[in-house]
Amino acid sequence: MSKKYAKETVCIQSGWQPKNGEPRILPIYQSTTFKYETSEQMGRLFDLEESGYFYTRLQNPTNDYVAAKICELEGGVAAMLTSSGQAANYYAIFNICETGDHVIMSSTVYGGTHNLITVTMKKMGIECTVVDPDASLDELRKTIQPNTKCVFGETIANPALVVLDIEKFATLAHEAGVPLIIDNTFATPINCNPFEWGADIVTHSTTKYMDGHAMTVGGAIVDSGNFDWTAHAEKFPGLCTPDASYHGVTYTEKFGKGAYITKATVQLMRDLGSIQAPQNAFLLNVGLETLPLRMERHCSNAQKVAEFLENHEKVAWVNYPGLPSNKYYNLAQKYMPKGSCGVISFGLKSGRTGAGKMMDHLELAAIVTHVADARTCVLHPASHTHRQMTDEQLVEAGVAPDLIRLSVGIENVDDIIADLKQAIEKAD
């Protein structure tokens, strides 16, 4: 949209802009291929001389309309959808890294992302230094290497709920001449825009709050357009030197601020796949329309539930950035003054055993791997999502053995609290 609107309006009106007589609702372009009148025109598409669609493995109109909406919400210049949040994080890093390169990553990122970067990408020859997000800038500077290509972290860590000091990590990245990549899944662009604090690339698992209904798996990457790749051309040859697979095109020369997303789309998506299905993109768009309303309820419910847990005699500890007693309260107020997220972590005095018993007695909340949708759900990360990590890695990631991850939904908050109360009473 040409005019700048509030996020609530963007969520409804941005993306698909129907012309006279066209459908009011975003269409699903359920087609693998697209027809052209001449061979020459299709050839221009393959040479990147003309924009358009020819195969859904690379691009699809439904996806692009939804990506444009997310891009506007984040304040970026270009965006793309992927098949999952994991794919988004992989593409975001691999788009600028290759064998022999190095990544700096916050230790408290989601377990699947931790494994992706420290184990899977290591097999590709990409090394990673895992850092304490609370370390001083001077300590963090010691991890910079000549082959460092990016710094990676999460706005709010899953499930440790560590609030990243985005400005500190942006300073670290930019002193190293590399971009800061931030996974903004838990905060969503409704509560935080990392670009305003120095981040360069933002990723999302759209599976979570953006979809909001646990119906689709997907991811997104948004480029701020602020990082000057050409100023550090020697670090980023994939963007700043000719690509032999496209007749020698140099992305930064041909596409300017759109270089990063263009390369990820036409090169990585072409070679690796991982496009989001158009029907999933359509359902994601439906979720985005109510994202501001849902985030308001998620956050208000979570605040009340966290306060209940903090005052319960059988609860050993509670971690929620909205509590004044929380270690990250001030950072949360700085970066997310309207609210952080709907996820709480806590532990019972009965420990790890009590956690399992409590979860087994829940009646309203469900035990599921998922997090951040409309329904209240719980998980024991040490037994589930982080099961592949060693005890040392769990401690490093901020995942205590007794940690229960509670994703507070948008049901009536009194019903949520009543369910937790009866289950906790039966946990001994």
Question: Whereabouts are the PLM-identified features?
Answer:
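Conserved small-domain helix->loop->beta segment predominantly found in fold-type I
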Residues: L272-I275, Q279-A281, V286, T290, ...
